[in-house]
Amino acid sequence: MEYQEDVFVGYRYFETIPGAAASVCYPFGYGLSYTTFALSDVRGGMNGAGEIALSATVTNTGLCAGKYVLQAYVNPPKGRIAKPAAALVGFAKTRLLEPNESETLTVSFAPYAFATYDDEGAVRKSAYVLEKGAYGFRVGENVRETVNVDYRYELDDDAILEQLSPKCAPTLLHRRMLADGSYREIACAPETPREDWRKLEGIPDEGQYPLENPDQIPGCAWIPPIKPQLIEVAEGDLTLDEFMSLLSDEDMARLLGGQPNRGVANTFGFGNLPTYGVPNVMTADGPAGLRIKPECGVTTTAFPCATLLACTWNTEIVREIGAAGAREVHENGIGVWLTPAINIHRTPLCGRNFEYYSEDPLVAGEMAAAMVEGIQSEGVGASLKHFACNNKETNRKDCDSRLSERALREIYLKGFELCVKKAQPLTVMSSYNLVNGLWASQNRELLTDILRGEWGFKGMVTTDWYTHAPQYTEIAAGNDVKMGCGDPAHVLQMMREGRLKREDVVVSVRRLLEMILKLA
């Protein structure tokens, strides 16, 4: 699936491409109200933190009480790199304003919020840049109904904000869209020859390892506990290094696969090494409320779906919903809630759009961060998913998302980046699909170089359930646990053959145990 529209997704397309605007009935950010509002004293400038601060006084000019969302958009200068005509850089929402009541709102953001990733070297290859020129700003109630801010962020020379290196470069993407609606061929990286993993490892077409008893996921039989116990690490009597030094390769291989359900859970668990007191931490979906086994007869709350939550533009409400849902999750004996989902509304045809927040990565990232903060405030782990580019449902285990590095970073990874840096979810779930020719679950540039190296992610990565990539390639890439079950024997075989480093296994086990200790 080629993302030839590049960064021109959603309103970025309709506000930029000539002739496209007429197709829009409801512009991005549009909302209904029982009252009317007016903006006054609109200002802009730099604050003491080196951020751009845009402010406006909002007055309720109608007859009913209401709230107003102040949305801030950047209008970048034209340059060597094609840019959307408008992009959201921040938003704020008033309290409930009575008729004739006013409130002054301020939206602050760093210049990085509107930087461009240069994947072709027009300014500086593999860097976030700001081309020289004047960057204008507008504020208002949607992308169309805005007023100009009498402030420009002006640069006499190009600025390099962050120098990175090429990651996840496309190998089979034919062209990319430009700001005038035309297309240009894109230079692709040479395709790296890869072995046919399934044939090599004897993996069946459905991507799952054959089990001796197909009706039961392999687990651990209960064995009377012996010392040491993981709780001794939690209580400070043992270091994690000391505890892990006593685990055999067989113990570690078992820990890196999903574990059987218990209680009301139906999406399996993590851990489950009773000999060493490692609990079986249960997981459960999902993005619209806790989903458990229907035959249990336990009812749960159906919270509004992610798209509806994003329509509130209210991160505090989303944070409270995350906390409320997490309390319900905890009451049902679940340790990790498999939410939020944060993929982009690239097309209305994606079957999981109800789980996703927005076509805009800033909205998605801010909402997801609030949700994660709410969930984890109650001692429950959040799982940020699906990392990354899960934008179709049919055949999503084998679909190859082919896109430029720029589109990947500015659109499809940006929400994940915002959420990770702001909220540090305990887990991230990699997606089924391939990203530029490599399954996301075995993509080291994505899971290690970008997620951990660039963004500073501290948690554990799991696969989505029953991915097609061999488990040992996933572990080597930084994907710690294979769900819903792994294959310990296969992992051990790859270790013996030298195709999987023991140190990679140790690192993944450490991340798993650190996650469990944070839940204890």
PLM region spans:
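Glycoside hydrolase catalytic-domain context in secreted enzymes
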Residues: 1-145, 164-520
